[in-house]
């Protein structure tokens, strides 16, 4: 990555949503899959703030830390986000979407809340933020790096 605040058009293109989806090996789950295999927030999943923001499953007789796929949906029926949990903590893939249904961000989380890789895009597909285990880059709508740092 560049350190002077600018990237070549080719470098920016490689961080665009379309390029990353096509060449980056990201798998995006369908709404049908998420609804069929996950649990929706507000129905049986809730934050337990007294326990440090663990996700709890209240669908049974007792509260248990949730392991599995959780999600929420916008009022228009489009998926808002889905993410995997292990023992009540984020662990696995998290995908967030704009109300239009377009992918907003994709994050890989490991060891229950540590981020390995994260992308966030503007709705038009331009990169907004890129994070890996070593660096973080924030971009404006013109593709210029506005913030960067080592992690």
Model regions: which residues?
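Glycine/tyrosine- and acidic-biased, solvent-exposed loop/turn segments at the edges of beta-strands
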Residues: 1-151
């Amino acid at each position: 990555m560049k350190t002077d605040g600018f990237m070549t058009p080719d470098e920016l293109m490689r961080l665009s949503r379309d390029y990353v989806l096509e060449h980056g090996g990201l798998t995006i789950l369908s709404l049908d899959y998420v609804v069929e295999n996950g649990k929706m927030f507000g129905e049986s999943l809730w934050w337990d703030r007294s326990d440090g923001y663990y996700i709890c499953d209240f669908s049974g007789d007792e509260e248990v830390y949730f392991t599995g796929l959780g999600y929420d949906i916008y009022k228009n029926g489009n998926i808002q986000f889905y993410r995997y949990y292990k023992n009540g903590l984020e662990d696995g893939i998290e995908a967030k979407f704009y109300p239009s249904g377009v992918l907003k961000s994709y994050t890989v989380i490991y060891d229950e809340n540590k981020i390995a890789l994260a992308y966030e895009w503007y709705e038009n597909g331009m990169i907004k933020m890129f994070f890996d285990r070593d660096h973080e880059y924030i971009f404006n709508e013109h593709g210029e790096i506005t913030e960067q740092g080592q992690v």
